[in-house]
Amino acid sequence: MITAEKKKRNKFLPNFEKQSIYSLRYDEMQQWLIDHGQQKFRAKQIFEWLYQKRVNTIDEMTNLSKELRQILKDHFAMTTLTTVVKQESKDGTIKFLFELQDGYTIETVLMRHEYGNSVCVTTQVGCRIGCTFCASTLGGLKRNLEAGEIVSQVLTVQKALDETNERVSQIVIMGIGEPFENYDEMMDFLRIVNDDNSLNIGARHITVSTSGIIPRIYDFAEEDIQINFAVSLHGAKDEIRSRLMPINRAYNVDKLMEAIRYYQEKTNRRVTFEYGLFGGVNDQLEHARDLAHLIKNLNCHVNLIPVNHVPERNYVKTPKDDIFKFEKELKRLGINATIRREQGSDIDAACGQLRAKERQVETR
């Protein structure tokens, strides 16, 4: 729930007349009902309508009194996302371009795996981190999303899956934006979708990825929630990482590793390092050795990512043979590593590509 205190801390939050009903955690809904002279148990009924029956309007909550429905309508909006573009890949990946109530657009991706359906969600409209390989940063940061707008991405995809009796089984917070720059709303989102009364998606089936916002890594280490944690690394030495990720100039590799060690000491949980391979930049065997040396004493996994080409950027794909050699070298040096399966390469599935393409159309 967006409070005055949260708005003070997060200047990029929207200032809507009514906040999304999906932005309330279960405990917040209970307290809100008490504060408005209603019975606490109604929270369970409301959440059932929102997350199990997945209704589109408050008026459909027929076991609530008309009075309570009106109070809810007076205070909250039922966040709806308008599908602007829906692209489906040959491999079953579906990419959605959603329009928000203020006209901004965001991307959400449904990825199908043998082990279930995974949804990649967006946390910001645009991004200001400035990674030089990413299309998400091209227009800068416009605003942060409410927790309810992040929840609505999962719900909208789930409603599409309802037609084939499928369910969202995993969530990755790796879409547009830096989740740790919208920390409070991201944490509310995590607690909402993980709640038994909501979508009940297990914490170990949810992964959040950061570019390395170090103060928030320390905060995340203190959270009492077993969410999987990934770090976009892409370079084991400052020179290369700063070229790819300007955030490294503020939070360099040594400081990042120190924060990650603290996280592991507090949580005893494995960290995944995302390592995109860029032809001629960070994909040689010497780079694999540098990476292995950097992380050798950590409980970690390396996810090697064959990069998707972004027309606005000049990076090229690493040849497949070189990718396999890189993986083999890491394993030889005792590092757990896998190559991410490419999905949606035929449908603008790289982060920010579809939104960037639509923005070009809009501005012509």
Swiss-Prot record:
Q: What are the protein's UniProt keywords?
A: 4Fe-4S, Antibiotic resistance, Cytoplasm, Disulfide bond, Iron, Iron-sulfur, Metal-binding, Methyltransferase, rRNA processing, S-adenosyl-L-methionine, Transferase, tRNA processing
**Residue ranges annotated for the Radical SAM core domain, each copy included:** 113-346
GO function terms (MF aspect): 4 iron, 4 sulfur cluster binding; metal ion binding; rRNA (adenine(2503)-C2-)-methyltransferase activity; rRNA binding; tRNA (adenine(37)-C2)-methyltransferase activity; tRNA binding
**Major location, coarse class?**
cytoplasm
List the catalysed reactions.
Answer: adenosine(2503) in 23S rRNA + 2 reduced [2Fe-2S]-[ferredoxin] + 2 S-adenosyl-L-methionine = 2-methyladenosine(2503) in 23S rRNA + 5'-deoxyadenosine + L-methionine + 2 oxidized [2Fe-2S]-[ferredoxin] + S-adenosyl-L-homocysteine; adenosine(37) in tRNA + 2 reduced [2Fe-2S]-[ferredoxin] + 2 S-adenosyl-L-methionine = 2-methyladenosine(37) in tRNA + 5'-deoxyadenosine + L-methionine + 2 oxidized [2Fe-2S]-[ferredoxin] + S-adenosyl-L-homocysteine
Cofactor binding note of this UniProt entry: Binds 1 [4Fe-4S] cluster. The cluster is coordinated with 3 cysteines and an exchangeable S-adenosyl-L-methionine.
Catalytic residues, per the record, are E107 (proton acceptor), C351 (s-methylcysteine intermediate)
Q: Where does S-adenosyl-L-methionine bind?
A: G177, E178, S209, S232, L233, H234, N308
At the top level, the lineage of the source is: Bacteria
Q: What class of enzyme is it?
A: transferase
Its localization reads:
Cytoplasm
Q: rRNA processing among the record's keywords? A: yes
Query: Where do the annotations place [4Fe-4S] cluster binding?
Result: C127, C131, C134
Q: Does the keyword 4Fe-4S apply?
A: yes
Please list the cofactors this protein needs.
[4Fe-4S] cluster
Intrachain S-S bonds: C120-C351
Record's signal peptide: none
Which biological process annotations from GO are given for this protein? Answer: response to antibiotic; rRNA base methylation; tRNA methylation
Could you say which protein family the record assigns here? Belongs to the radical SAM superfamily. RlmN family.
Q: What is the protein's given name? A: Probable dual-specificity RNA methyltransferase RlmN
